Regions:
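Nucleic-acid endo/exonuclease domains
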Residues: 1-64, 70-115, 119-152, 156-173
Length: 173
């Protein structure tokens, strides 16, 4: 498994080129955030994870079978090997659990997470996926900014505090 690259993979490069061409600027593999996201867009407070379908168990289903525990079924894009199956099932399960934990930590820190799957970047689906990412990023940006401007607007529209008056209406001398 030492030959498996975690940075600069082909799916990651497709997403990077697509976002750059659409005007989005990002940092790569930010070390200070949990999970080491593939792309970090600080302006949008968003982390993008480009996951390989096999390594992260895309659409892998686990169902409980009476007596024997769990039955794991692969998907179209994630086929679990038949040899040494228990090892691969445990590895994929750990990867999925780690991904969930990292995304929870990022959400607690106020970051948004987008997961892009390798199978979504096939030539037939590529443009649609990249447009969906761009739409989601713009939506996040507008939602975050609207919340801040709404807070400012509410503060401005609140009743002014009772200020002391320089001259009283009625005076008794």
């Amino acid at each position: 498994m030492a030959a498996i690259h975690s940075k600069d993979t082909k799916p990651e490069m497709i997403v990077r080129r697509g976002l750059w061409a659409r005007g989005f600027r990002y940092r790569l593999n930010h070390k200070r955030l949990p999970g080491h996201a593939d792309l970090v867009l600080r302006k949008y407070r968003t982390c993008i994870f480009v996951n390989g379908c096999f390594w992260h168990g895309h659409n892998v289903t686990e169902s409980q079978v009476q007596g024997s525990g769990f039955k794991v079924q692969g998907s179209e894009c994630c086929k679990i090997p038949k040899t040494n199956r228990e090892f691969w099932v445990a590895k994929i399960r750990r990867n999925k659990e780690r991904d969930r934990e990292e995304q929870k930590k990022l959400a607690a820190m106020g970051w948004h997470c987008i997961t892009v799957w390798e199978c979504e970047l096939t030539p037939k689906k590529r443009e649609e996926t990249l447009e969906a990412i761009a739409f989601t990023l713009n939506h996040i940006y507008l939602q975050d900014r609207r919340c801040k401007t709404d807070d400012v607007r509410r503060e401005r529209d609140e009743e002014p505090m009772a200020l002391p008056m320089a001259a009283e209406e009625e005076s008794c001398f």
